Amino acid sequence: LIAGVAAYLGDVAPHVKVIPVEYDESACLKAALEANERVILPSVGLFADGTAVAQIGEKPFDVIRLQKSDNSGPIVEPNVVLVNTDEVCAAIKDTYDECRSIVEPSGAMALAGIKKYVAEHGIEGKNMVSIVCGANMNFDRLRYIAERTELGERKEAIFAVTIPEQKGSFLSFCRALQGRNITEFNYRASDASAAQVFVGISLKN
């Protein structure tokens, strides 16, 4: 997709910059650009399955490297924006909130990348476009995405905590949170002296 967009913009709008975005567990373009040759990733993450490839294609890689902008530099920025699962889930929610459409993880990567790029570079007053490339969503995956969205939006933090296995420990833990909401709580008995707690905490704005 990015090679085709770069080739087209190189002809009709060479002043436009193309910002590559990849899922951080299958970043084959980033690896190839850093090595200046195509490489095979040892493993790829399958959450964004539409872009889960271990090696970028030969011709797309050539197009990405050779396509020039109007200032004779590469039209595709050499620094790939990497997005993680939580950021992709948040972008899926953003798309739904704005358009009432559900996109697949790979389809939401571009929006997740724009959000991250804008935040990191402090960009204001610029026209930026994300290309939604797919909506092949498995319904069973929606619950997982909904749960991860709060993390991606920095509205929830997940902690693994060890507390004493004794009366009053949970109350003391809640008091230590100073009024923050507990969004999730999982307890597993491990031994007689300590309890392992997996807890989600709502973050204040």
Question: What is each model feature region?
Answer:
Residues 1-71, 116-124, 128-164:
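Glycine-rich phosphate/pyrophosphate-binding loop at beta-loop-alpha junctions
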Residues 7, 57-125:
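Active-site-adjacent helical/loop segments in soluble small-molecule enzymes
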Residues 20-24, 82-84, 104, 183-191:
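Beta-strand->loop->alpha-helix junctions that form or flank phosphate-binding loops
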Residues 22, 85, 107, 135, ...:
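Short beta->alpha junction loops/turns
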Residues 47, 76, 97, 105, ...:
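A generic structural signal for well-ordered coil/turn residues at beta-strand boundaries
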Residues 47-50, 78-81, 100, 159-163, ...:
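Short, glycine/charged-rich beta-strand-loop motifs at protein surfaces that mediate ligand recognition
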Residues 139-205:
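A conserved regulatory-domain signal marking ACT and ACT-like small-molecule sensing domains
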